[in-house]
Amino acid sequence: MSTTDTIVAQATPPGRGGVGILRISGRGAKDVAQALLGKLPKPRYADYLPFRDAAGATLDQGIALWFPGPNSFTGEDVLELQGHGGPVILDLLLKRVLALPGMRIARPGEFSERAFLNDKLDLAQAEAIADLIDASSEQAARSAMNSLQGAFSTRIHQLVEALTHLRIYVEAAIDFPDEEIDFLSDGKIEAQLNGVMADLDSVRAEARQGSLLREGMKVVIAGRPNAGKSSLLNALAGREAAIVTDIAGTTRDVLREHIHIDGMPLHIIDTAGLREASDEVERIGIERAWNEIEQADRVLFMVDGTTTAATEPAEIWPEFMARLPHRLPITVVRNKADITGETLGMTEVNGHSLIRLSARTGEGIDLLRDHLKQSMGFTSNMEGGFLARRRHLQALEQAAQHLVEGKEQLVSAYAGELLAEELRLAQQALSEITGEFTSDDLLGRIFSSFCIGK
């Protein structure tokens, strides 16, 4: 669709409410004001007046706000009509606006898209609007606001600027090879490159934490039947989310609970006990359990402490460990400490964390919560933090890889042309985050996930 049309959409959620808002953006916004209000309101002042139909009858009365472009959210002329929040009233107002020439309903996210296209905000800031609306915790909301205010974008621009300066030196070394000082071999370019790589690593670490805050950490509870997996799910969730009995194989399907630990979102998944299936239903449940394990960020390997004194995972269940995806982090949870009399606490066993607790009594659960936070590098103090999406992490990873390859070309062969190309590609990958180098297809996918009125 054309981005020069005048668009309209309801900016408040559907349903009944005290206030309902229509947002209009585009060259025809002033025509809407003249038609419904009889005048053009004073810019950026609230004006209380009737909203009229084509015959001059009052449809509603409320507040009109007029923002002439380019000093508006979208960079275009914008009119907001704030009336009563009844569905019928809003529908009448919407039909009235759409009856005027050149008006159409906005696509999802089109207001934010126009703001991006008119350089009112970059792509990372536009995405932060949707993240702010979807925030599931106070910390996520604060980090989304930081992103909206440019915290993430500023870090990216600093990296791009540093790469620009570095490219200048490299291009100079290529263009003037006969100069007395060889910039490629005197160590200065390598030192600058190392500095950029260190800064990029810092941003990547913050972005991973921002992604964790946005997406949540997927933790799968796995183990043999009757190890206490469902009891642990209930203890972490703080409610009876799963049925708990002494009958082996009670849990036959995947159970999911979404919880927060000091603002960190976690997706806790209880799975069927892993063993040789006794019937088709149990076989399907075990297959689903392994599917969840393979997609997990961390596995809590539940062990019934009354059945073994072993603490080494490979000794407890070698077949289970052999099937786990490579490098998938696991935490061994020795359950039923209230029965075995084991001392509660956490230790390290051959690179794996081991926690002794009682899911039934709740003893040791707080220790597990702290461990889950620490294992993902999460801190409750993220005042300057920002949210990040998977595409951001991918772009940062691509940029880092290009810098690694560029350094290899510099150190091994002083290949200036190849280094310059890797620097350019790294810069392009970073610019995709803010939207300076982004395909139209990607823009369409990003903004289509927004609300209609945003």
From Swiss-Prot:
Binds 1 potassium ion per subunit. InterPro entries: G_TrmE, GTP-bd, GTP-bd_TrmE_N, GTPase_MnmE, MnmE_dom2, MnmE_helical, P-loop_NTPase, Small_GTP-bd. It is found in: Cytoplasm. Its main location: cytoplasm. GO terms for cellular component: cytosol. GTP binds at residues 226-231, 245-251, 270-273, 335-338, 358-360. GO terms for biological process: tRNA methylation; tRNA wobble uridine modification. Coiled coil: none annotated. Its EC number is 3.6.-.-. K(+) binds at residues 226, 245, 247, 250. GO terms for molecular function: GTP binding; GTPase activity; metal ion binding. Its cofactor is K(+). (6S)-5-formyl-5,6,7,8-tetrahydrofolate binds at residues 23, 80, 120, 454. Mg(2+) binds at residues 230, 251. The keyword Iron does not apply. Residues 216-377 form the TrmE-type G domain. It is an enzyme of class 3 (hydrolase). Keywords: Cytoplasm, GTP-binding, Hydrolase, Magnesium, Metal-binding, Nucleotide-binding, Potassium, tRNA processing. CDD domains: trmE (cd04164), TrmE_N (cd14858). Belongs to the TRAFAC class TrmE-Era-EngA-EngB-Septin-like GTPase superfamily. TrmE GTPase family. Homodimer. Heterotetramer of two MnmE and two MnmG subunits. Exhibits a very high intrinsic GTPase hydrolysis rate. Involved in the addition of a carboxymethylaminomethyl (cmnm) group at the wobble position (U34) of certain tRNAs, forming tRNA-cmnm(5)s(2)U34. This is tRNA modification GTPase MnmE. The gene is mnmE.
